[in-house]
UniProtKB/Swiss-Prot annotation:
Binding of Zn(2+) 2, residues: C354, C357, H365, C370
Name of the protein in question: Protein nanos
GO cellular component annotations of the record: neuromuscular junction; neuronal ribonucleoprotein granule; perinuclear region of cytoplasm; pole plasm; postsynapse of neuromuscular junction
Annotated positions binding Zn(2+) 1: C319, C322, H335, C346
Compartmental location: Cytoplasm, Cytoplasmic ribonucleoprotein granule
GO terms assigned for molecular function: mRNA binding; zinc ion binding
Effect of H335Y: Strong defects in abdomen and oogenesis
Pfam families linked to this entry: zf-nanos
Substitution effect: P347S: Strong defects in abdomen and oogenesis
InterPro entries found in the cross-reference section: Nanos/Xcar2, Nanos_sf, Znf_nanos-typ
Sequence segments annotated as region (Disordered): 181-207
Effect of S336L: Strong defects in abdomen and oogenesis
Zinc finger (Nanos-type): 318-372
Length: 401
């Protein structure tokens, strides 16, 4: 139809150039009416075959040139407000939400890392503080132990008497008592009652006085008092001697004749001690040794060993070890080899160290009496017996000369 109209318009144009005849004038008029109707309907003006344009400003045009509205084509009023790509808009919103979530998780991770670093720093500070406190405590313990050791070894001014106490006790009981310090533990003594300084000073002054003296006589007889260190040594020796006497008396067997022996021993000790105490002098070591040896000798007399068909064996009252080593008579008779508790008393034997088991001190012994010695054959026994006989004969010859 559009083609036919164009052909008609072309014919009309030809007719205008070449005036048609009257026979064709009716057709031309009819053709012009068709073009006017078309122009009124669509607003299309044809000026020529080469130039074609759309006239949308015609006054007679009641329609607007716009694309047809289809279900696929969006509404122009709404398309201007929204994007042309709804799927891309949804993906952009999703991307923004994902980006926000990523940023939130990143900041949360940074915060957790900062908290972890702070906790590690606090733990390191606590560990360093604990190590420093432990080192300070160890240093304090070492310093305290060194201080105590220095006080014990060197002896401070206030503990000067205590440092000499051990020396005096060792000198007084050397060779006559064992080195067991547990028997003279003074820690079990009852605690002293707290007194005013004045009464305590008077009591100390009264302790330094001889027996039978009154502390009120200090002002009149101040020149006859004992020095404080000397009185302290005397008190310590007296206490040690009382411990020895009480221990020896407590282990005496219950026999009818032991009461007289105990009374005799107590009388001897009291007379010997009364000399020193009456004069205000410290007890001599000889008096202590005499009292302890008398009790030891009495205990040895009460012991009767029944061996070899109940034959009584005499207990030696001298040191056999010193006798075998050709010591002087005074040394031999001054002590015995062992005490009532089977502890070594001989000072020379106490210093001997057994080459087999390494025993010394209270359990010191020679190789002959070593419990860990190897089995001796008959040849070894014969050699030892011959050596013993030769040695005894040699000593006898020396004694005769």
């Amino acid at each position: 139809m559009f083609r036919s109209n164009l052909e008609g318009s072309g014919a009309a144009a030809v007719g205008v150039a070449n005036p048609p005849s009257l026979a064709q004038s009716g057709k031309i008029f009819q053709l012009q009416d068709n073009f006017s109707a078309f122009h009124a309907r669509g607003g299309l003006n044809i000026l020529g075959l080469q130039d074609m344009y759309l006239d949308t400003s015609g006054a007679n045009s009641s329609a607007t040139l716009s694309p047809p509205i289809t279900p696929v084509t969006p509404d122009p009023s709404t398309s201007a407000q929204s994007t042309h790509f709804p799927f891309l808009a949804d993906s952009a919103a999703t991307a923004n939400s994902l980006l926000m979530q990523r940023q939130y998780h990143y900041h949360l991770l940074l915060q957790q890392q900062q908290q972890l670093a702070m906790a590690q720093h606090q733990l390191a500070l606590a560990a360093s503080a604990a190590a420093a406190s432990a080192s300070h405590q160890q240093t304090d313990e070492i310093a305290r132990s060194l201080k105590i050791f220095a006080q014990v070894t060197t002896g401070a001014a206030e503990n000067a008497a205590g440092s000499m106490q051990d020396v005096m006790q060792e000198f007084a009981t050397n060779g006559y008592a064992s080195d067991d310090l547990g028997r003279m533990s003074y820690g079990s003594a009852p605690p002293q009652v707290q007194m005013p300084p004045q009464q305590q000073h008077q009591q100390q002054q009264g302790l330094h006085l001889p027996l039978g003296r009154n502390p009120a006589q200090l002002q009149t007889n101040g020149g006859n008092l004992m020095p404080i260190p000397l009185a302290t040594h005397w008190l310590n020796n007296y206490r040690e001697h009382l411990n020895n006497v009480w221990r020896n008396m407590s282990y005496i067997p219950a026999a009818p004749n032991t009461m007289g022996l105990q009374a005799q021993t107590a009388a001897t000790v009291s007379t010997n001690l009364g000399v020193g105490m009456g004069l205000g002098l410290p007890v001599q070591g000889e008096q202590l040794r005499g009292a302890s040896n008398s009790s030891n000798n009495n205990n040895n007399n009460n012991k009767v060993y029944k061996r070899y068909n109940s034959k009584a064996k005499e207990i030696s009252r001298h040191c056999v070890f010193c006798e075998n080593n050709n010591e002087p008579e005074a040394v031999i008779n001054s002590h015995s080899v062992r005490d009532n508790f089977n502890r070594v008393l001989c000072p020379k034997l106490r210093t001997y160290v057994c080459p087999i088991c390494g025993a010394s001190g209270d359990s010191a012994h020679t190789i002959k009496y070593c419990p860990k010695k190897p089995i001796i054959t008959m040849e070894d026994a014969i050699k030892a017996e011959s050596f013993r006989l030769a040695k005894s004969s040699y000593y006898k010859q020396q004694m005769k000369v």
